Amino acid sequence: MILGASILQLPAIRKAKEMGLQVITVDMDENAIGFKEEGIICEVISTIDSEKILEAAKKHNIDGIMTLASDMPMRSVAIVAKEMGLVGITEQTALNATNKAEMRQCLKESGVPIPQFFRVSSKEEYEEAIDYFKTSKLKCIVKPADNSGSRGVDLLSDLSDEELISRAYEYSKSYSRGGDIVVEEYMEGPEVSVETLSVDGECHIIQITDKLTTGAPYFVEMGHSEPSAQPEDIKVRISEVASAAVKAIGIENGPSHTEIKVT
């Protein structure tokens, strides 16, 4: 069962068919491009409706469940895997992997290097976080706790501009599904992403990629270059940090995508 049937999930749908597997796809859009593939079973269900997805999974007696290129269905994947005794991640791990506040707390507790951060649920907490960075004379970045693709991200490089500070809060909050945002120290340096595959708790590095973004203040991804041009000793350290991060949030089986700033 593959959660999501958009163009982003299409390669997985086709690969699974190629392997001779019976593919069940789930998407709330009855016109999703993945539903047009021949020989697949289509279930028109929201990928975050874990209860209905579980019903469909039991109906089809599935042997595996996955998603890709989408954060939101991870909780559904975890719930179905647990209920049906399939290989997968736990619901807590799904939360750790898709909520920046939860993730940073896990990384901090495990000693993985991360910037100073604050989980913010209200305007008062936001003002307290901003006061910390004003006192420390550090740039900070504001982002929704539970979104992706650089949505709602804003850099605050001038903490004397109260209008900019207020606007960043409203902008980031508007992209937060649960209402929480993260305010964290802005780290200077090139950004890389690390693709890994974990098997029985062992994290294997697949590729390190240099990321190309628009830069401040929104950091929208524009492209990628692989393999990374970083020096070998830096790539070794990147691999160590990525592996530690994957283990810290609880991923024991499956692929992971980790983003790291080299400082």
Sequence positions of predicted segments:
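Short catalytic-loop micro-motif centered on adjacent basic/acidic residues
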Residues: 2, 64-67, 115-118, 155, ...
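Short hydrophobic patches on amphipathic alpha-helices
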Residues: 57, 130-133, 246
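Conserved residues at the C-terminal ends of beta-strands
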Residues: 68, 120, 209
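Active-site nucleotide/adenylate-binding loops and adjacent lid/helix of ATP-dependent enzymes
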Residues: 99-181, 188, 200, 228-240
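Phosphate-binding core of ATP-grasp and ATP-grasp-like enzymes
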Residues: 171-180, 185-228, 236-263
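ATP-binding N-terminal substructure of ATP-dependent carboxylate-amine bond-forming enzymes
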Residues: 1-93, 124
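Hydrophobic residues in well-ordered beta-strands that form the structural core
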Residues: 25, 88-90, 116, 141-142, ...
